[in-house]
Amino acid sequence: MVYSSTSSSQNRPDGEKHVEAVGSSTRIPSDELVDRGGGDTTTGKQSPRDIHGWKWATAYSAMLSTTLLFALDNTIVANIQPAIINDFGHLELLSWIGTGFALGTMFILLWGKVYGVFNIKWVYIFNIFLFEAGSALCGAAPNMAALIIGRVIAGVGGSGMYSGTLTYVSVLSNDQEKPAYLAGSTVVWGIGSVLGPVVGGAFAASSATWRWGFYVNLPIGAAFAPVYFLLFPSFDPYPSKTLAEKLRLVDWINAVIFLAGSACLTVVLTFGGVVYPFNSGTVIALWTVTGILLVAFIVLLKLHPLVAKENRLYPLHFFKQPTLINMQLQVFLSSGIILAMTYYVPLYFQFIKGDGALEAGVRLLPLIMFMVVASMVNGFLMPRYGLIPIWYIGGSSLALIGTALMYTVDDSTSNANIYGYNILIGAGTGSYIVAGFAIVQSLVPVHEIANAVGAMTIFQDLGMVLFLAISGSLFHNVAVDKVGKALPDVSHTEIANLIAGSSSKAFQALSDTEKALVIPEIASAMTTIWAFFLAAAALSVVCSFPLLKAKIGGMEKRTAITAA
């Protein structure tokens, strides 16, 4: 995630204030002059908000609470998946517990456009309601299908809350205040990401059960509800426009096509070879529909008869800028590696080392903490000293070394070694995982900054969704094959249930002799996941070297704060 204080003043004949909010970037008029070249300037000294003192502190705290919940929900299921499978079964849907939430966050591109058109307060509150409703459905879910639907809804609302927080902070603070307030969001996001697996593991191991990993969002949301309604300022970017006029400013058709295509791609990657054979009619049909929707999306970006060019979801001419595309690929790869690691490192410790859910969650701390710290150090140093290629080459190289070492992990590898490998991956990816959000702002004109950052955000989400889906499919297919060979007398269904987690009934029912046969095969199956991450890190290294010749300047002229 990235937060930038760059702003732009735009005069409008109708006297409306223009707000561009895309994913994690919002632009508003302010009064501190910053020269970007080409005559574009920004300004900002006076605080633009009407609330101050305890009211503003309370409102800001409420915004941070939504960031905490969103970050917590992003990683909380990493350690409660085995308990969920124990209750519901359907191992083939295991990856959807995480993928469903990540898929819902794909709405962040649409929410960014919506916040730039409609009243921020009510869009924000609507997203809080969506998130809480999704959490309630997850907690009360009677089956796996209901849980996955709840996760998708929570992801949709959570991405809207996150986008809303950044929009509000950008609208309600000037350029001097903005870095400090956004740094607060950085810290809270890091805390939530670290606590997620630990909190989830604690609930899974207690009498409260895994359901409270989702219910916990409800009392926190209820406690801050009065603040949302009474203290959050009402801010309408286009007060003189009618609802119909506002609706025409959003590219709804292409948004639906994009989301449908993302869903089809995720389904085929998750279910291919797990639920349906790779050569089945269902898988072939899903790939076909995905391709058709992709073509339709690109065509409408170029030739949309109902939406003005500046209001389309993605500027097609960005594909003509190699460095900008490089930044999008880098955030896709690094974000995918980190999120998938938070799911499979605990699974390794539970299966191979016999950890409980809580203990396995704690084992993630080296990975997450070093990622957060490295990201914050990058956000502090890169805008001041530049050296952009070094951050990318150095960071991706560390990630490559870490993933290569993870590829050597087996059932006898010491915990200390795994911690060290995780530190390399965390520090490496953290060095550049969100650096591109600030860099792209030096590659485009002021009026396209929001679009550039929005494109980065959607590639970040795509990386998380697709890496979870691919990792889940790889693990399931390889583990079923290897464990099946180790236990030839056990049925395919029982083996599928067995690899759901060390707390699964099927695994617990094994004798010590059988467990001794299965555990090395599980560790071996996980090497396919580490190999996938290794390939992604290697691609990241390769893509980093062209940055040595890329013209990326002016970073020191803009205030940018990056956060994981």
From Swiss-Prot:
What PROSITE patterns does the record tag this protein with?
MFS
Induction comment: Expression is positively regulated by the depudecin biosynthesis cluster-specific transcription activator DEP6.
| InterPro entries named in the record | MFS, MFS_dom, MFS_trans_sf
- Transmembrane feature ranges: 65-85, 91-111, 122-142, 152-172, 185-205, 212-232, 255-275, 281-301, 332-352, 362-382, 386-406, 423-443, 452-472, 528-548
List localization entries.
Cell membrane
Q: Which portions of the chain have biased composition (kind: Polar residues)?
A: 1-12
Record GO terms (molecular function): transmembrane transporter activity
User: What's the chief localization of this chain?
Assistant: membrane
SUPFAM superfamilies reported for this sequence: MFS general substrate transporter
Record carries keyword Transcription regulation: no
Pfam families noted in UniProt: MFS_1 (PF07690)
**Which residue intervals make up region (Disordered)?**
1-48
- Please note every region of biased composition (Basic and acidic residues): 29-38
* UniProt entry keywords in alphabetical sequence: Cell membrane, Membrane, Transmembrane, Transmembrane helix, Transport
Q: Which domain of life is it from?
A: Eukaryota
Q: How does this protein lie in the membrane?
A: Multi-pass membrane protein
GO cellular component terms?
Answer: plasma membrane
Q: Give the family this protein belongs to, as stated in its UniProt record.
A: Belongs to the major facilitator superfamily. TCR/Tet family.
The task this protein performs is described as: Efflux pump; part of the gene cluster that mediates the biosynthesis of depudecin, a highly oxidized eleven-carbon linear polyketide that acts as a histone deacetylase (HDAC) inhibitor and makes a small contribution to pathogenesis. Is presumed either to be responsible for exporting depudecin, to provide self-protection, or both.
Q: Which protein, by its recorded name, is this? A: Efflux pump DEP3
Gene name, please? DEP3
